[in-house]
């Protein structure tokens, strides 16, 4: 391979590296913007907050577009050497789509167990709150209008009904 071919290869690769470096810098800027918006949320005016939010969305959009472009360039150059000026071919890798599913499944199971525990704790708290609300209820106007009765259906507060029961 001649030095001219080596320079061409380095050009394509260097362009990809430079492009990824720019994307990385934009991601760092995005993180910095997030940090500043959280720090200044309570202290600055609404105009500043909306401007910072707009800047975040703008940077995020630029990062997404640049990443899509790089992915397209990589996809176009897989298995084809004539897609770029430097005749660089990216070899296909068949194992790229495989993920560590065991670790992901274990993490998912742990998260689901934690959620179930939290939900059951919430339900217990709700039932305790409902029970405590049922035990102590302030009298309402409708409660004061109700007449208390004994097992015979007679008014407890009415003395005449007691006298009738005693005579029987």
Swiss-Prot record:
A Pfam family the protein falls into: Med11
GO molecular function terms attached to this record: transcription coregulator activity
GO cellular component, one term: mediator complex
Gene3D superfamilies xref list: 1.10.287.3490
Comp. bias regions, Polar residues: 130-156
Main location: nucleus
Any GO BP annotation: regulation of transcription by RNA polymerase II
Subcellular location: Nucleus
InterPro entries from the UniProt entry: Mediator_Med11
Protein family according to the UniProt entry: Belongs to the Mediator complex subunit 11 family.
Self-association and partners: Component of the Mediator complex.
Name of the protein described by the UniProt record: Mediator of RNA polymerase II transcription subunit 11
Gene name as annotated: MED11
